[in-house]
């Protein structure tokens, strides 16, 4: 039987040692209970209804997630984490917790029984229970959990967990968590997501990013651990494309993470020198004319990315009618997040996608970005 790519334990150790020699710490992430489609494709019984699920060939948010009502779910997680924790020396372990639709949980007899036994009425609190069970497993191995800020929708999240703030959709509970002493890493998608093109997250925007939640800055808070730029690879076609997305934006976030932002023109001048050196080493940096796209160039940069993400034929997107129907709720949700209500119907028509993107981006010129100039 053929399998996809994997690392042996010795290869993992080699990567960890290689990174450590360069003063880099590798922290593993196994996202759960959502973003587990591959896990469920291999072990269908871990989902609510145990239905066979094909391994998906494109990214998205899917309704089939791990079932917190089944004891075998936690038995599997314990075996998995026991093996993986032993490989990574750092005391932090990321368990995700983001984008976990409760659609199947609401129909699942196992979840219903679990909620009744625990006296729960809110499915977010069922995820909170799931998180606590996984955190308890990690603690047995001397690990501290890192979670996306979605998990704060459940009550009384342990401040021993580290929260990674990525989305304003679930920002309301973040200030209270910080006030209770909880530690937060800032990775706001509106500036620090580097799979987004420069037309969405420009170099200027990254350089002026501030850790603001609900209108309050946490730049001086002792509970703000720092920044982390994220780059998800579903839409990254080649190593050269990866490097173009990273540099010089990674220079910007490195500078502001260790210091306050200074004069942007001075930073740009230094960035030019850095990419000259990097280019001589074979690194494919974004050229200066692409750092801060304006006008139609900015709009086209963003529109191309969105069209690439959502249209059949793009990297990691559904190619058949059946696949497109399977991911349709994800596309509709994405459209509702990024577009005006009147654009959503047009989003579902392939030939009008870029037009809708153009209309949307024209509504938000760079000077209106919340992070610019702060």
What feature does the model see in each segment?
Residues 360-374:
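Long, low-complexity, intrinsically disordered segments
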Residues 144-161, 167-364:
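Flexible, acidic glycine-rich loops studded with aromatic residues
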Residues 100-101, 325, 369-372:
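Intrinsically disordered, low-complexity regions of eukaryotic proteins
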Residues 1-143:
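Substrate-binding cleft of carbohydrate-active enzyme catalytic domains
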Residues 8, 127, 165-166, 267:
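Charged, low-complexity surface patches
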């Amino acid at each position: 039987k053929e399998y996809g790519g994997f690392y042996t334990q010795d290869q993992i150790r080699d990567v960890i040692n290689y990174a450590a020699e360069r003063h880099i710490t590798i922290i593993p992430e196994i996202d759960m209970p959502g973003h587990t489609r591959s896990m469920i494709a291999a072990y269908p019984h871990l989902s609510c209804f145990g239905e066979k699920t094909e391994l998906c060939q494109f990214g998205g948010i899917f309704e089939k997630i791990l079932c917190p009502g089944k004891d075998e779910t936690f038995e599997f997680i314990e075996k998995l984490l026991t093996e993986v924790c032993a490989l990574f020396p750092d005391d932090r372990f990321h368990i995700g917790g983001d984008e976990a639709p409760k659609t199947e949980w609401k129909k699942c007899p196992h979840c219903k029984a679990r909620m009744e036994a625990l006296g729960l009425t809110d499915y977010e609190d069922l995820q909170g229970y799931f998180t606590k069970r996984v955190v308890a497993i990690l603690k047995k191995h001397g690990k501290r959990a890192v979670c996306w800020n979605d998990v704060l929708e459940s009550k009384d999240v342990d401040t021993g967990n580290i929260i990674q703030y990525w989305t304003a959709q679930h920002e309301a509970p973040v200030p209270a968590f910080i006030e209770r002493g909880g530690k937060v890493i800032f990775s706001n998608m509106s500036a620090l997501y580097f799979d987004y093109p420069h037309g969405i997250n420009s170099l200027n925007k990254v350089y002026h990013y501030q850790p603001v939640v609900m209108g309050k800055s946490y730049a001086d808070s002792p509970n703000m651990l720092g920044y982390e730029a994220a780059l998800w690879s579903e839409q990254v076609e080649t190593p050269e494309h990866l490097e173009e997305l990273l540099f010089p934006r990674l220079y910007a976030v490195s500078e502001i993470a260790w210091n306050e932002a200074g004069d942007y023109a001075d930073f740009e001048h230094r960035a030019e020198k850095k990419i000259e050196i990097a280019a001589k080493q074979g690194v494919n940096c974004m050229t200066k004319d692409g750092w801060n796209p304006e006008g139609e160039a900015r709009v086209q940069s963003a529109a191309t990315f969105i069209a690439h993400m959502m249209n059949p034929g793009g990297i990691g997107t559904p190619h058949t009618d059946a696949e497109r129907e399977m991911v349709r709720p994800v596309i509709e949700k994405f459209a509702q997040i990024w577009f005006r209500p009147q654009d959503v119907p047009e989003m579902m028509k392939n030939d009008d996608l870029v037009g809708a993107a153009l209309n949307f981006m024209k509504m938000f010129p760079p000077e209106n970005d919340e992070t610019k100039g702060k």
